[in-house]
């Protein structure tokens, strides 16, 4: 009887750990995903980089993406 209870508890613990790990992996945003200024939402080795958009001199808002940490984009010179 003790063996059945122990086995049941062990299985419950294993299933719980697998579920928690799956939730933690799905909680972060992959590379190229739209993010907010909350840097914690991007997966490891990624940061949320934002820039302001302009069209014909008028600001059209801010866009943010998860990109590799340290990577910098710059405007192409025409």
Curated annotation (Swiss-Prot):
PTM annotation, UniProt: Contains 4 disulfide bonds.
InterPro entries from the UniProt entry: Spider_toxin_CSTX_knottin
Chief localization: secreted
Coiled coil spans: none
Keywords from the UniProt entry: Disulfide bond, Secreted, Signal, Toxin
Listed Pfam families: Toxin_35
Domain of life: Eukaryota
Any one GO MF annotation of this record: toxin activity
Cell compartments where the protein resides: Secreted
Free-text tissue specificity from the UniProt record: Expressed by the venom gland.
Positions of the pro-segment in this chain: 23-26
Signal sequence, start to end: 1-22
One Gene Ontology cellular component: extracellular region
Family according to the record: Belongs to the neurotoxin 19 (CSTX) family. 07 (U7-Lctx) subfamily.
Name the record gives this protein: U7-lycotoxin-Ls1e
């Amino acid at each position: 009887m003790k063996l059945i209870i122990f086995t049941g508890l062990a299985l419950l613990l294993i299933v719980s750990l697998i579920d928690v790990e799956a939730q933690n992996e799905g909680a972060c945003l992959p590379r190229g995903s739209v993010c907010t200024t909350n840097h914690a939402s991007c997966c490891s080795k990624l940061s949320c980089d934002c820039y302001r958009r302009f069209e014909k001199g008028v600001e059209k808002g801010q866009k943010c993406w998860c990109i590799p940490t340290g990577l910098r984009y710059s405007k192409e010179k025409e």
